[in-house]
Amino acid sequence: NDYLSKIPFRDALLKRLTDVANYEKIGTPFKKHGKYYFYKNDGLQNQSVLYVQDSLDGEPRVFLDPNKLSDDGTVALTGIYFSNNGKYTGYTIACSGSDWQEIYVMDTETGKLLDDHIEWAKFTGATWQGDGFYYSAYDAPVKGKEFSNVNENHKIYYHKMGTPQSQDKLVYQNQAYPKRFYTASVNEDETILFLYESGDGRGNALYMKDLRKPNAPFVAMATDMDYTYAPIEVIGDKIYMFTNYNAPKYRLMTADINKPALKDWTELVPESENVLSDAGVIGEKLFLTYDKDAANHAYVYGLDGKEIQEIKLPSLGSVGFSGDK
């Protein structure tokens, strides 16, 4: 600080940076359960505010203002998660730049903060299934060593709304590999629970559990952590997969729920000369984003893997998609 304070143009540089950052920023709207949400920053707010409106031309109102989560601005909003039934909105926060996360839940309709509160979560979101959600956490650390102890034995829990964290159900742990990380996701119809294992390679292992069968075990889909395996949706018995397995620039494959092992997967959209950077299922179509010449290019494919059209963008830039299957 002594050195920086002696820079003669420091104040001028700060003023210039402040001037160029001080403009209104509005994010792309997204639709959830009949309402429209978007992030907005008036210019110099530390964090963008999430707004909601009842229709595209409706009056926006504040849904969640992360700047009010603390008086000193040390609490950051790290994620927001809407339940599939529309009743709840979970959000994760981190304090003072820590990796530790806390999960809170609001009533989506009223905005009321509910009593449900999760502590000592880490590297996680809130993955909803019914009136509850899956999350990843460690055991509570020794008091006074919250930021110095080595974290081991990452676990996945299920929290049922209206109950204390102490009653949360342990869904998965693997004490044979205490330094690995475990996270969960659920498809839109809440029929399949996916388990991701990472920390021993550049990618992840992937397992699945059929939630329609209460006592079904986790079944291995792919275990080589040198590759990335990401399910993007489940339609019928078919799991659509985004992966770089034997395809450095990524491709789409499909797996059968009844025969989910990697050896039985089928290629759907082959690897291209351009990197496939994102994929999703929206309105029974595949929306694919490729990186070409330092810009995104968007395409629509059928669920059969055949290209339908390129989406012509107004200019070079980046693009993203969101929506229901």
Each model region followed by its residue ranges:
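Peripheral, non-catalytic segments that deliver or gate enzyme domains
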Residues: N1-D2, P8-V62, K68-K325
